[in-house]
Every structure is written in C-alpha cells, then in structure tokens.
Amino acid sequence: MSLEVVARHFDALGSTCELQVVAGSQAALERCEQQVRLAEARFTRFVRDSELSQLNASHGRYTPVSPQMFSMLEAAVWAYQESGGLVNAAVLPALMAAGYDRPFIEGLSQPASVVAVQPAPLVEVLALDRPTRSAAVAPGVALDLGGIAKGFLADQLIDELGDNAVCNLGGDLRLRGGGPEGDGWHIGLCDRSAVALTDGGVATSGVTRRRWGQGMHHLIDPRTGLPARTDLLEVSVVTDCALRGEVYAKCAVLLGAVGGAAFLEARGVHYAMLPAEASRAA
C-alpha cells in the first residue's frame, strides 16, 4: 500500500523547486520553502544589499558573515579543490562579460563583443577566518555562488524534511527513505533512465536551461573564461549528496564526453550523459 506524499512546488533560485515528504505536513514544507527564500536573498548577486553583494564590494577587507554564508564559502573552496579548479566561484566577471548581468527571467541579450575573462584561482582570492567567522574577497574579484547553491541547500534542508523525503532544488536533489512504496524514491536522469534510491543525492548540470544570444549560456569554462564548448548537453550524477553531484556533473560537462566519463568513472559514481547529437536526432 502506498503511503501519502505531501508535496510543495515553488519557484526560487532561478528554478522550479519541489519538496516531497511521506506522511508529512504542509506546515513543514512551508518552513523549508521559507528557508530556501531566505538563503536565496542572502546568496543572490542581483540585489545590491544582499550578503553576497556586500562581500563582493568589501574591497579585500575581512567582513563578518553569517554562519550559513561561511559554510557556503567553505563549500565553494571545497568545490574548487575537488574539481581541480573547474568549479570556480570567482567566475562572476566572466558571467557578466558573457551578458549574464541580470536575472535570467528578465531576458538577456548578446553582448556587442564577447570578451574572455578567466577567473582568478579561488583559493588565491578568497580568504576565510574561522575564529572570527569572516571572509575577504580580493579587490577586483567577485563571487557567484549559483554554481553550488542548489546542491548546498538541498543537503542542508533534507534534515528538516525528515527520514522519508526529497528536496529537489532545480534538478539538484537530496533524498532519504523508502519513498511512498518503500522501494526507494524513483529519480529520472537526463538520458530518460531512472534510479531508485533510499539515500543520497542526484544532480544534473548542462548547457540547455539558460541560453541567450548566439551560443551564450551560463556554464563558464574557467580555462577559457567563456561559455563552455562541449559535446554534452547534460550530465546527471548519482552520489552521496547533492553538492558533490552538482560539482561532479559540472566537471563532466566541461570536460566533454570522453574526459567527463573518465572523471566520473575514476570517482566510482553512477552517471548519465545526454550528448549534443541527441538534440539534432530528436
């Protein structure tokens, strides 16, 4: 017998989000949605007085930050190191140069000229001081946390949702429990296959969701400072948490089908790829 699933859908973080809980309450889901919205207000680069914007404007001075921001910045450093520099939060100037200078929903336009802006190595331009819970961003550098925010938050919120739940933030999700049928939550991957999981994370990254102009998209290759040129449209990764999946999926897209497969297989994770030729054959 299937158990009742309580669900809540909402738009946040530039994406569609879905929370599902077996035998849960709408009140609990509403509280989690509110936490997502508060985090979005903290991490956005599109609001001048957000915590991230203030940090970006600190001109190299150490600035006290909230506990959640400090944890997010630590996650950004981990992502940079784990990815060998492919996931680099110091990518904001490159995004701006590519035309991603406002929320995507407001419409983006092709820049008059596309200028490559290679991001500085994050570990050289972001300093963290744990005793004072403060951070410093080097002058001339600006961070964008959108590349890891959804996975980071999904991992945080799963504890709020309980022992049988899914937190899906724009395709980056964390889950636990047997689902309504008891055999795990059934999660679709980018190649239309599916997996049944009772604990872990699934994340999908690609170049199909935020596109504008001619060949412009939001996934910057830090090796070139330009929107990535890749033979993959999307990659889904199944691993122990949403943040790791998000980082690994981005790496695979940036590395392309051959390099991405080698990267993921070396880490022993399940994955699915959607090659660019799949769109032409459809």
Question: What does each of the following model-derived ranges do?
Answer:
Residues 1-282:
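Mature catalytic core of soluble alpha/beta enzymes
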